[in-house]
Structure formats: structure tokens, C-alpha cells
Curated annotation (Swiss-Prot):
<keyword id="KW-0173">Coenzyme A biosynthesis</keyword>
<protein>
    <recommendedName>
        <fullName>GTP-dependent dephospho-CoA kinase</fullName>
        <ecNumber>2.7.1.237</ecNumber>
    </recommendedName>
</protein>
<feature type="binding site">
    <location>
        <position position="51"/>
    </location>
    <ligand>
        <name>GTP</name>
    </ligand>
</feature>
<dbReference type="Pfam" id="PF04019">
    <property type="entry name" value="DUF359"/>
</dbReference>
<comment type="similarity">
    <text>Belongs to the GTP-dependent DPCK family.</text>
</comment>
<keyword id="KW-0547">Nucleotide-binding</keyword>
<comment type="pathway">
    <text>Cofactor biosynthesis; coenzyme A biosynthesis.</text>
</comment>
<feature type="binding site">
    <location>
        <position position="120"/>
    </location>
    <ligand>
        <name>GTP</name>
    </ligand>
</feature>
<comment type="function">
    <text>Catalyzes the GTP-dependent phosphorylation of the 3'-hydroxyl group of dephosphocoenzyme A to form coenzyme A (CoA).</text>
</comment>
<feature type="binding site">
    <location>
        <position position="68"/>
    </location>
    <ligand>
        <name>GTP</name>
    </ligand>
</feature>
<dbReference type="InterPro" id="IPR007164">
    <property type="entry name" value="GTP-dep_dephospho-CoA_kin"/>
</dbReference>
<feature type="binding site">
    <location>
        <position position="50"/>
    </location>
    <ligand>
        <name>GTP</name>
    </ligand>
</feature>
<dbReference type="GO" id="GO:0015937">
    <property type="term" value="P:coenzyme A biosynthetic process"/>
</dbReference>
<keyword id="KW-0808">Transferase</keyword>
<keyword id="KW-0418">Kinase</keyword>
<feature type="binding site">
    <location>
        <position position="49"/>
    </location>
    <ligand>
        <name>GTP</name>
    </ligand>
</feature>
<dbReference type="GO" id="GO:0016301">
    <property type="term" value="F:kinase activity"/>
</dbReference>
Length: 172
């Protein structure tokens, strides 16, 4: 079973990693689209309501997405009907629960909408670990940037963050 809890060094998880776009949409999505086309990226996974909405609104449909349907701006994500399978999971802030991990395992195959009761932020790590080659994982940075991780190039470095997570026990 796989369950992780953020226990220390929260600052490392807030760092804006490799491809960080400090532009508003649609320009931020256009930058990622250019990257995807230039490097023959085959899979895009988004984590977060605003990022997912922007990708869908500006024509760059992710392979699978994870949202919690809560944003500071009260934004509703349109276009989620594109995803054929909906998986609902519980995932408290600072965690990647077993059920959330299992949902990401399924989502990397494509066509999955993960609806999170709690917080989806940490699921970006699960997507980075589990995504197939030629994938990008995109999420929003808390200061307003769009972060896109090309997993082939940065997976090993970013997975060192798991050293700052503790495995957790979940009640059945």
C-alpha cells in the first residue's frame, strides 16, 4: 500500500520547478503547447482546478486531471465531461493517500478525472512518479505561475522529495 504524508521541509515543495511560466493564460498555456509540440510530448496531466480549466479552455486537453473543485476564486471547471472515468478520492492536505495513489495509477493510462475531497496538490508527485515517458505534469504555483514538469528529464531529481515524506498508516 502507498500512502505518504508531508512531514518536513514544506519549502522544498513550494519551489517553482523546471518549466515555470510567469504569464497569465492564454499565454501560459501557449508556452506549454509550444513545448509539447517541440519535444513530441504525448501525455499531459494537470493537477488543480485553475490549471485544468485553463488547459481545457485554451485547447490543450490533458490526458487525465486531478481537481478538488475548490479554488480561491470560485472558478468552475468546464469541459470535464471529456473524461470517461471519474474517480472520487479522499486526500487530506499534505497527503497522498492509498486511494489517491491508486487513482493516479489508473489516471496515467488516460481518460480519468480524479475528484478529490480534500486537497489535490500532492498528487502532482504521484503523477511525476507514475507517468509514462514523454509526459508533462502541470500544476499551479501558489504565487500564480504555471509549472510544467517534463518527467523524462526531471523525474529522478524531483522524486528526491519523497525523502521528506513519511509513509503513513491508513485505517481500513
Amino acid at each position: 500500500m502507498t500512502c505518504y504524508k508531508l512531514s518536513r521541509r514544506r519549502d522544498l515543495f513550494a519551489f517553482p520547478y523546471p518549466l515555470t511560466v510567469w504569464r497569465d493564460p492564454p499565454r501560459s498555456v501557449e508556452v506549454v503547447r509550444d513545448f509539447v509540440e517541440s519535444y513530441d510530448i504525448r501525455h499531459i496531466y494537470t493537477v488543480g482546478d485553475v490549471v485544468t480549466r485553463n488547459f481545457l479552455e485554451y485547447g490543450l486537453a490533458p490526458t487525465s486531471v486531478a481537481v478538488d473543485e475548490k479554488t480561491r476564486r470560485g472558478i468552475k471547471v468546464e469541459g470535464l465531461g471529456l473524461y470517461k472515468r471519474v474517480i472520487r478520492v479522499n486526500n487530506p492536505p499534505g497527503y497522498i493517500t492509498e486511494e489517491a495513489w491508486a487513482a493516479v495509477e489508473e489516471a496515467v493510462e488516460g481518460g480519468v478525472l480524479i475528484k478529490v475531497d480534500g486537497e489535490e496538490d500532492m498528487l502532482s508527485l504521484a503523477f511525476i512518479k507514475l507517468a509514462p515517458p514523454r509526459s508533462v505534469v502541470a500544476y499551479g504555483h501558489y504565487l500564480g505561475a504555471l509549472v510544467a514538469i517534463p518527467v523524462d528529464w526531471y523525474r529522478d531529481s524531483i522524486l528526491r522529495l519523497f525523502n521528506y515524506l513519511e509513509q503513513c498508516q491508513q485505517k481500513a
